[in-house]
């Protein structure tokens, strides 16, 4: 177990508590190398990983950025999918034009782009419409689903469960044990594979 990442043992909630999770750097401090062990474990082959915050909105984005930087530094092509944006976009339409926007670092892209938010759903996209994920798998070594807390928007839980594995991001001093347990059980109820927990310090 690295200082960043606690693997789940037999689905035990104990492995998800802040006391047993390991600490990640803040988004501002994240550097290539900080997530090296996590990357070796989860991305030894092309993978789609959901990174979702447990109860605290926004902390998962910094973790996604750190993991993406680690992968990009190793020469892997990475796409980050902001799930809150995807839930406001019709993936059936935008997937035909799989345009992605390069971000600051080489080898990192974002999909869908802000410009592709032209059709708002009355209902969130169903997991059965996962052709967009299959298309991304054809083009990228790593797919990072940047998921807000699973109870913050309809559809987040279902999209998190579509990934090969899910990481829960816990903020020290703010995420409660009860919230972690609730999120763990909700993800497992949808068949999600819980890979571990990352502890971040609050700002």
Regions found by a protein language model. Give the residues of each.
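Electropositive phosphate-/nucleotide-binding environments in soluble metabolic enzymes
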Residues: 32
């Amino acid at each position: 177990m690295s200082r960043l990442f606690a693997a789940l043992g037999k689905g035990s909630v104990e492995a998800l508590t802040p006391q047993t999770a390991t600490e990640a750097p803040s988004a501002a401090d994240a550097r290539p190398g900080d997530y090296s062990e996590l990357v070796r474990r989860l991305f030894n082959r092309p993978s789609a990983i959901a990174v979702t915050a447990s109860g605290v909105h926004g902390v998962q984005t910094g973790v996604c950025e750190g993991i993406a930087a680690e992968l990009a530094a190793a020469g892997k092509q990475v796409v980050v999918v902001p799930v809150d944006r995807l839930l406001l976009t019709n993936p059936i339409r935008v997937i035909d034009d799989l345009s992605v926007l390069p971000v600051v670092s080489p080898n990192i892209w974002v999909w869908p782009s802000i410009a592709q938010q032209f059709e708002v759903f009355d209902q969130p996209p169903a997991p059965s419409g996962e052709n967009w994920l299959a298309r991304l798998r054809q083009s990228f070594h790593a797919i990072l689903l940047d998921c807000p807390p699973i109870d913050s928007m309809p559809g987040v839980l279902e999209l998190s469960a579509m990934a090969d594995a899910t990481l829960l991001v816990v903020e020290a001093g703010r995420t409660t044990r009860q919230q972690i347990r609730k999120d763990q059980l909700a993800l497992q109820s949808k068949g999600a594979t819980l890979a571990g927990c990352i502890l971040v310090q609050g700002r």
